Design a protein with these regions (language model features):
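Anionic coordination/interaction segments
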Residues: 1-371, 382-395, 422, 427, ...
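Aromatic-rich carbohydrate-recognition surfaces in CAZymes
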Residues: 72-75, 370, 377-385, 389-496, ...
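Alpha-helix capping and helix-loop boundary segments enriched in small/acidic/polar residues
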Residues: 129-133, 361-365, 380, 415-426, ...
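Beta-rich accessory regions
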Residues: 133-157, 212-233, 275-280, 287, ...
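Conserved H-X4-D acyltransferase segment
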Residues: 142, 366-380, 653-662, 728
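Acidic/histidine-rich catalytic neighborhood
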Residues: 171-175, 185-190, 448-474, 555-586, ...
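Short, glycine/acidic-rich hinge or "gate" loops at secondary-structure transitions
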Residues: 173, 293-296, 405, 445-455, ...
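Extended glycan-interaction surfaces of carbohydrate-active proteins
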Residues: 320-362, 389-410, 479-514, 551-716, ...
Length: 885
């Protein structure tokens, strides 16, 4: 990736940023500030859908738009040069010998571009970050340096367009909404405060302000300010602005520009740079609740000392977001994990919107995003997420379906992004998986007895009837009840082959056109696994003696009944209909106690039933290998096929049959062989999501209308590839699992091909370009796979257990490898030594020590951890030797 990593903290350098103009980097903070920035300083800045500071930027805006952050240098002869590379002259030199080089350096979570005017020998380094401390602001630190032997005289000007309204207004009254603008020019810069928030359903008075402020390194303000975009560009453009080129007069300070598109253009005093001399300019861009709050930000942040301290504070804050550190035989792998480890936090901030590729939706995360991102957070601070996990169950409806969009606060839910009635059939799976991981990490089995509300929005009968429930009633239940409800209703929603109905989609959102006859073999297998996990959790709860039964609505007796033919398709459907009808008709205060052992036995029976159906109906055997059919389409026909010359295969079904325990030991090697033969493409990042399917068959979903190799139709989709790795590791196939994740991060780090910064994207396009970077659930699964399966550091009801599956090439030259992480509120450094070159299946822990004291079986009990010092890093050493046959 150009020059590669600069240290062991993930900081990196790319030599030719000008060749990656569409590459963007996130700048954000947990206070809600979200930004993106490119090597040309394009991108946007916002707080939410209705509060964009800079104009909204999609991928195409990065390519063709001119709007963005800019910093001009006007030399004595009138020549203009842009520190962003965005002047007419610089653009005209692209792809010629005179093209300007742009170096990009970045780290957690700061971004720097370095450009040099070779004629003038003037270098500009622009460092950008969003402070981790209070203040809804982005800071742009510009450092000019005279690298030549002659004195330079120049006039610097910062110029940043202020959009100041909703993204909706890009194509909805763009000009009309500009008439609401009121921009005040001040010595600090420009404050824009629109009079109203425009919405034809009801306009509301606006208080929110947007601003651009700036100072020199010696605390001086701009000598001229321009707030009117028309006056700034004149008869020029954003890449040749008349106000800068002609040094036109500034606005009257304290004056107001009304009804115009706004820019924060700040001209600083002419300066003289002697050879070797540097000069710093600091620009603040952001938003505040009102004008007074904006003025307060200026008072606090327009300080050279405060700004410089902020950069170091921000680096430290992001460094601590991901406390996991690895040391293997590959420093590139160790460094990219620093970036992958912060991706769940980035998705918590951005949701699934607000980066250039993610130009859909209006913020918020989806249901499964909520639970999967929590998996990543469980690795760093499991003790702090319990309240959030309980609150998340407030999105479950009484019929076992759920809200699909999550608001900004835990427990805040919306039915759907676009107000559409949709049911994703996989949604009941993820909470069980996450709660299982939480209990294993913490030993907090009593979370199952905590109480959460149910989501009520009028939808009933599994989302098929609107306004089915006329009046909201106060309904609550335990976490165990919520999970049991999701599992049992899913089991009863049977398709004609006995698999679970696909409904409006599963994990693959693009399988959205088979609501009548579609079935998901993939998530039938997943639910078989999650039912077994829930049964294990309830059995553990029973064995603690805390309770022998749980309180449930009386209607649960329908779902738990085991009358003759209880598992038949007809019986399952009839039960579901009766249950959902009673959800509407019968008050929830009619409750009964149901023994835990009865529930556990029933869940195991349901899991066994689903496994038997999958094994009987979904296995595809060929002469060379075999795999499981993942889906039935809306014709009721299998999507996959093993006929020679017509073979069709999808990865999703293989992941969940392995992970859910459906695939047997003899079938897993066959599945892997088939996946290597039909799906593997190393140059594209590893295992594709599917082979070519029938592009004319729209009886499964929109995915088949996508060009093959893109997104859900045949791309290397990181999320499922990483889950494939996790599934293989979980069943003891370490080398096979590593082969699924290694090509992903290798390609991601090859910036000439992937065109992205470190981290893993949602998928790779056919040419290897990483698409939709940063905001992907694959990051949490990658960290889970590395920590729990590769390094084998996992929880078992609160105990720390070591079960490593590291490959011999992952050890350093001393045959050692290590990981630093938190567990049980304590910090550990776990060091493995491989005594001879062995595969994971050949070695075991022959000796282990905690702080130089022996521990048995590589296991530290919760009682032992309780006595450990919270302030130190505890050293666990384990020696790996050959298993005794």
């Amino acid at each position: 990736m150009g020059s590669g990593f600069l240290d062991d903290m993930g900081s990196f350098r790319i030599e030719h940023g000008e060749k990656n103009r569409l590459n963007y980097f996130p700048l954000a903070a947990e206070n809600g500030v979200m930004a993106s920035i490119t090597p040309e300083l394009k991108g946007d800045l916002k707080r939410d859908q209705n509060s964009f500071v800079l104009p909204p930027a999609s991928e195409e805006d990065l390519r063709s738009g001119m709007a963005g952050r800019n910093f001009w240098c006007r030399f004595e002869n009138g020549e203009l040069w842009s520190a962003a590379g965005m002047s007419a002259a610089q653009i005209a030199e692209e792809f010629t010998p005179a093209e300007e080089k742009c170096i990009v350096e970045a780290g957690l979570l700061w971004h720097r571009t370095v450009r040099e005017n070779r004629t003038r020998q003037l270098r500009a380094a622009v460092t950008s970050w969003v402070p981790s401390a209070n203040g809804t602001v982005e800071i742009m630190q510009v450092m000019l340096e005279n690298c030549g032997e002659e004195t330079l005289r120049l006039t610097p000007t910062a110029a940043i367009p202020l959009y100041g309204r909703s993204a909706d207004n890009l194509r909805d009254h763009r000009h009309v909404t500009s008439l609401l603008n009121r921009a005040e020019s001040r010595k600090e810069g420009v404050i824009l405060t629109p009079t109203y928030s425009f919405d034809e359903r009801g306009h509301t008075p606006n208080q929110r302000s947007y601003f651009v402020f700036g100072i020199t390194e010696d605390g001086k303000s701009a000598e001229a300010v321009c707030a009117d975009l028309d006056r700034y560009t004149g008869e020029g453009s954003l890449i040749m602005p008349e106000w800068v080129a002609k040094e036109l007069p500034g606005d009257s300070l304290g004056g107001e520009t009304a009804g115009k598109e706004t820019i924060g253009a700040l001209r600083f005093p002419e300066t003289e740079l002697r050879p070797g001399e540097k000069r710093e300019y600091d620009i603040l861009v952001g938003t505040a609740e009102d004008k007074a709050a904006a003025e307060q930000i200026a008072a606090v942040w327009l300080s050279l000392y405060r700004i410089r301290i902020s950069l170091e504070e921000t680096k430290l804050w992001w460094d601590q977001v991901n406390p996991i550190r690895t040391h293997t035989g590959d420093s590139d792998f160790d460094n990219i994990l620093r970036w992958i480890g912060i991706q769940p936090t980035l998705r918590r901030i951005y949701g699934c919107s607000f980066l250039p590729h993610h130009d859909y939706g209006k913020g918020g995360r989806g249901w499964r995003d909520l639970w999967q991102d929590s998996l990543g957070l469980l690795l760093s601070e499991p003790e702090t997420v319990a309240d959030d996990l309980v609150a998340y169950f407030g999105g479950v409806r009484l019929d076992g379906t759920n809200a699909t969009i999550i608001g900004n606060r835990p427990g805040e839910f919306k039915a759907d992004r676009n107000g559409i009635q949709r049911v994703w059939m996989d949604h009941g799976y993820w909470p069980v998986l996450t709660i299982w991981q939480y209990i294993q990490q913490t030993g907090d089995i009593e979370i199952l007895l905590r109480v959460a509300p149910f989501f009520q929005d009028g939808l009933g009968m599994r989302g098929t009837q609107r306004d089915a429930i006329q009046a909201k009633r106060s309904c609550t239940g335990t976490v165990a009840e919520h999970m049991l409800l999701e599992q049992l209703t899913a089991f009863c929603e049977a398709g004609e082959h006995g698999l679970l109905r696909l409904r409006d989609a599963d994990w693959n959102d693009a399988l959205d056109m088979a609501p009548q006859r579609g079935e998901s073999g993939a998530f039938t297998s997943a639910y078989a696994g999650s039912m077994e996990l829930l049964a294990k959790m309830l059995e553990t709860l029973r064995q603690t003696g805390k309770c022998s039964s749980i309180d449930l609505p009386k209607r649960f007796a329908i779902l738990l009944g085991e009358e003759d033919n209880w598992a038949s398709i007809a019986s399952r459907r009839e039960k579901l209909n009766r249950f959902c009808t009673q959800c509407i008709q019968i008050p929830d205060d009619d409750r009964i106690q149901i023994p835990l052992d009865k529930i556990v036995r029933h869940l195991d029976l349901c899991a066994d039933t689903l496994k038997a159906i999958i094994r009987e109906k979904a296995w595809i055997q060929t002469e060379q290998d075999g795999w499981f059919n993942s889906y039935y389409d809306n014709y009721g026909t299998p999507l996959e096929c093993g006929t020679p010359g017509q073979e069709r295969m999808m990865l999703t079904g293989q992941v969940f049959t392995i992970l859910g325990g459906v695939a047997t030991k003899s079938e897993i090697p066959q599945i892997y062989h088939a996946a290597r033969r039909l799906l593997y493409a190393r140059q594209a990042g590893g295992f594709r999501l599917n082979t070519r399917l029938n592009p004319e068959d729209f009886q499964i979903g929109r995915m088949l209308a996508f060009a093959y190799g893109h997104k859900e139709n045949g791309a290397v989709f990181s999320h499922m590839s990483v889950m494939f790795a996790y599934a293989l590791y979980s069943r003891g196939y370490a080398r096979e699992g590593f082969s699924a994740i290694e090509p992903i991060w290798r390609l991601a780090l090859d910036s000439e091909k992937s065109r992205i910064y470190p981290g893993i994207p949602e998928y790779f396009a056919p040419d290897g370009r990483g698409m939709y970077p940063y905001l992907t659930g694959s990051a949490a699964w990658m960290m889970l796979c590395v920590v729990q399966e590769m390094f084998g550091v996992r929880g078992e009801n609160g105990a720390l257990c070591l079960r490593p599956q590291l490959l011999p090439e992952q050890f350093d030259v001393r045959n050692r490898t290590s990981i630093i992480l938190k567990f049980g509120g304590k910090a550990f450094k776990i060091v493995y030594t491989l005594l001879e070159r062995l595969e994971p299946s050949e070695y075991t822990i022959v000796k282990a020590e905690l702080d130089n004291m022996p521990i048995a079986d590589g296991r530290i009990l919760p009682s032992e951890m309780g006595a450990l010092d919270k302030e130190k890093i505890h050293i666990v050493e384990a020696w790996l030797g050959r298993k005794v046959q």
